Amino acid sequence: MKLEYPVYRDKVMGCWAGKNVGGVLGAPFECKRQFNGDVDFYTQDLSKGPVPNDDLDLQIVWLAAVERYGRTVNASILGEYWLSFVTPNWVEYGTGKSNLRAGLLPPLSGHVDNVYRNSCGCFIRSEIWACLAPGQPQLAAQYAREDAIVDHSEEGMYAEIFTAALQSAAFVESDPNTLIDIALSYVPADSALARAIAEARRCYQNQVDFREARKRVHNTAPGTFGLQEWTLDEIPVKDNEGMELGTPGFDAPENVAFSMLAWLYGEGDFGRSLCLANACGEDTDCTCATLGATLGIIMGAKNLPEKWLAPLDDKIATLCINRTSEGVWVPATVTELTDRVVRQAPLFVGQQLCEIYAPGGVVFECRSGRGLYCPQSARYLKGLNGHKKDIDLTPAEVAALTPYHVRYAYPAFSMDVDYRGSVTFTPGIERRITVTLVNSFTQYQQQWARVTLYTPPCAAVSSPRTVMLPLNNHVGAKAECTFAFTADETAPAKLELLVDVALEGRHSNGIAKVTLMAAEAEAGF
């Protein structure tokens, strides 16, 4: 399916304009568990332009990373931008940055000791990946995961993958239920996110009163975002009867589901849909902004109601970006942001998916129909010749990995370091890590890999320290080894190891640092 540049640009413009509208509408009601059903327009004084809102800020930082690193941008690069250019340290943001500084790489940084790993801070960053990969939800989901795992995991990560896939597909599909089905194919079917969205759809199909639907969605995956600023005895009773308190930090499933609920009940009306999202309470700037961006992509900027656009006057106000250095150029308007994004997209998707010399101008090649859904694993007989076969993990399979798998990609091979469920070690108790290598199926050569574990003097290795492993390129081929070591009582509180992989007869190599923290733990990791 072809997406011509003028249509694409209008949809990107609609995305950011809708994001801006929703964020401004919902901001005054954020962190409040209440039903805001009487709100039908902005409540702030906008005479001097929109108020700052963090829902758009971080994506401006990610755009700066893409402008420098292009399609090679990954979780590690985004982590560097977190440390340099993102100022807030609240909950998951601060924990993610703290873990990075301690030497824990993504996805460990987003998971370890992160009470808010399932919260809303990353699904609000999905639009940049959708706009850079229009009509390519598989690609958008891949980059959304790289973004999410820096400061989230599990349900928080699923939420960004879901919204990125949905918004990417929205460039070529407009039916809400079809788009929801597409996006759900990229996340685990048994996730709380999937259950909450299923409840939202069930309520709409059965025409449940919207107030009651809000309660049902909440109770399916109860979070606590609406309690952030209240003591327990300050929570309003009105409209909250029967609502469970929820689990702190478990906020993404219900808030994404609130956006879907409002979209369905809004039945195509931009303003009504956003006001319904706002009516649900909890993380209202996020739910409204995500829905506004989604509708903006579907409708395009030209079809968004002027009533909502005019008070904002195309302006962007930022809150969370470190502007004291030259690393990030902050756009002043939605138009400037749009121009910068559309300039990067052809390079981001590559020449196979974008023809810049097409008659009439730039044209994007988009997926359609079943091609928008997450692909299923190729079902080849193990051991077959892998030549010209796509046997990489699908986005859904990667999302299902535990956060203790740190993955690395190199030109001639990929590596997975499995921390085996923990980032801790205990002196005197054997500790293990598993290294898995997969050959590159673009280089088409069998090879041997030499894998070596380097440890400080305080750690004795009880397995072979160096192994030679064959890397074949048939279906299902992988090379795996487990290193076992024991730190003695002189070990520091932070133990740093190096896994070195070198290919025989090639200059390619890869080094992974493994960081472990001293703690009381059971043996057998």
What is the role of each PLM region?
Residues M1-A64, I77-L78:
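An N-terminal structural lobe/cap that precedes and organizes the functional/catalytic core
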Residues A358-T426, C458, S462:
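Low-complexity, acidic Ser/Thr/Pro/Gly-rich terminal tails and inter-domain linkers that flank the onset
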Residues P427-Q443:
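Short beta-strand elements of extracellular/lumenal beta-sandwich folds
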Residues L100, S109-R117, C131-Q136, R145-V150, ...:
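Accessory "access/gating" subregions that flank catalytic or transport cores
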Residues Q447, T452, E489-F525:
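Terminal connector regions
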Residues A479-T490:
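Short, hydrophobic beta-strand segments
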Residues L469-A479:
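Short proline/glycine- and polar residue-rich coil/turn motifs
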Residues V21, L25, K32, D38-F41, ...:
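Catalytic phosphate/nucleotide-handling subdomain of diverse soluble enzymes
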